[in-house]
Amino acid sequence: MDEMKDKIRNCCLEKEAAPCVSSCPFHLDIREFIPRLERKAFNLAYRLYANSVAFPRIVAEICDESCKKVCPRKEIGGAINLSMLEKAAVTYADRTDPSSFNLRPKGKKVAVIGAGISSLACALRLANKKYDVTVYEKEDKIGGH
């Protein structure tokens, strides 16, 4: 038991990269996310989450919790239910408008091929950085397969 606690302390709290962060497709900084929620700083938690995932409400609902599979806590009482924490950040934050920055337009055009969620997230990130983005989709609707 002490060996497991040391492993959790080292890889989740202190020294090593947390396995949950590397298993998350968005690399959400869980070490920062959870303490913000513990302090009930939902707006700060939401901002961190939104900066990682681009579409926070959608991702909070469809998250497959890949982090649970690698969480060392699963062996001593259960993995952290990050999906519920994501939903809490989305639900209880009262400032969810995108941040606005006064950046000058880049003057460059970018084409994004496909309108699945990953392509739309890419287009959103580029547009936020003031690129002129055009999304091309061969189907009549967006959202991917």
Language-model features: where?
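Ferredoxin-type iron-sulfur electron-transfer modules and their immediate structural context
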Residues: M1-K109
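Residue-level detector of alpha-helix initiation sites
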Residues: A54, G116-I117, K141
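Generic detector of intrinsically disordered, low-complexity, polar/charged segments
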Residues: R104, A111-I113, D140-K141
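N-terminal Rossmann-like FAD-binding beta1-loop-alpha1 element of flavoenzymes
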Residues: K108-V135
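Glycine-rich FAD pyrophosphate-binding loop
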Residues: Y131-H145
